[in-house]
Amino acid sequence: MGYYSLTEVTAVQYAKEHGYFEKKANVVCHEIGDGNLNYVFKLDDGEKSIIIKQALPYAKVVGESWPLSIKRATIESKALQIFAKYVPEYVPVVYSHDEELAVTIIEDLSKLTITRKGLIDGEEYPLLSQHIGRFLANVLFYTSDFGLQSEEKRVLEGTFVNPDLCKITEDLVFTDPFGHYDTNDYESELQLAVDELWSDKTLKLKVAQYKYKFLTRKEALIHGDLHTGSIFSSPSETKVIDPEFATYGPFGFDIGQFIANLLLNALSREEEQRSVLFFHIEKTWSYFVDTFTKLWIGEGVEAYTKEKQWLPIILQNIFTDVVGFAGCELIRRTIGLAHVADLDEIANKETRIQAKKQALSLGRELIKYESKNADIQLFRALFQQTVSGGVKA
């Protein structure tokens, strides 16, 4: 029959045909997706519920003028299954995948809350940083040359060639926000700050280096889009979703994106409400380092993991990348194509513009920072310096 887009009616038919519900069951279906690339349906018969996710052959945020391969759905399904191999407690269960229709049927997580929404609403997730730090350490270690035999790693890397979505990252994270491109989207009040950003040659040289790292460093399997909208949370649970951008890339990319989105939320808050975000930033890194170190010592398969002086070098290199990638994410989420509600939903316009100027300023500082021998306290220090020092009008 070939590919066709599901509707709420045909999603129910599909689920029944594949044995998820009885033929006569009264199944309620709603399209609940709020992302840019897919349809997401929730199906519920009163006794059980499932999620059907279907990749569209174009970017929903733009329309059919931006075609995308539906093979990304297979990438996402495979990534979730790889993640589940190492940290099943932090990902939804994948029930099945239909490559022809680009349909994946997964566990319903609606008892949890999208982390971005929860943080905006002032919810606290005490285990968020512990869970994300451990998730990242396990996935990154076990899919790298340190935790996987080199032959196996090369084979696995070949299954995550993801050109369409990697091109989106290359453009929307590393290129477009730093120059005159039609994809950029920002308020006129930011124009002076944007002009200053675009004329900063030192900044552009650093961004070029981070883009090159993303293009060439195939260190481990990365989620590729690990922001707070790609995580479900409750006070006791954390689930990572939507790894359709998964590919082999730099160790520090996912960590940097996650930290940047915590910083964006911090910028949207009053000063006295920010401490929990810095707690999570610092604990994410400390749990990552602790877990990665234990795996390195106990599970390392690469001969040189026995060299005690190598691990600190690896961790410092990762941290350097975390800082720069976080800076790029701050800027792209402020003036690029895909904004975040943390900033865009600040009700007072003057406050919103000020927060966005601060995001641009902080992003620049992070990208340009020479972070040799720096530690995770850097984020708190640069944030306080940027916000308390104000920004140029």
Swiss-Prot record:
Catalytic reaction list: 5-(methylsulfanyl)-D-ribose + ATP = 5-(methylsulfanyl)-alpha-D-ribose 1-phosphate + ADP + H(+)
Chain sites annotated for binding substrate: D225, R332
Pfam families with a match to the protein in the record: APH
UniProt-listed Enzyme Commission number(s): 2.7.1.100
UniProt enzyme class: transferase
Keywords recorded for this protein, A-Z: Amino-acid biosynthesis, ATP-binding, Kinase, Methionine biosynthesis, Nucleotide-binding, Transferase
GO biological process per UniProt: L-methionine salvage from methylthioadenosine
Pathway in which the depicted protein is active: Amino-acid biosynthesis; L-methionine biosynthesis via salvage pathway; S-methyl-5-thio-alpha-D-ribose 1-phosphate from S-methyl-5'-thioadenosine (hydrolase route): step 2/2
GO molecular function: ATP binding; S-methyl-5-thioribose kinase activity
Stored InterPro entries: Aminoglycoside_PTrfase (IPR002575), Kinase-like_dom_sf (IPR011009), Methylthioribose_kinase (IPR009212)
UniProt similarity note: Belongs to the methylthioribose kinase family.
Record NCBIfam families: MTRK
Quaternary structure annotation from Swiss-Prot or TrEMBL: Homodimer.
Function: Catalyzes the phosphorylation of methylthioribose into methylthioribose-1-phosphate.
Name assigned to this protein: Methylthioribose kinase
Organism: Bacillus cereus (strain AH187)
Name of encoding gene: mtnK
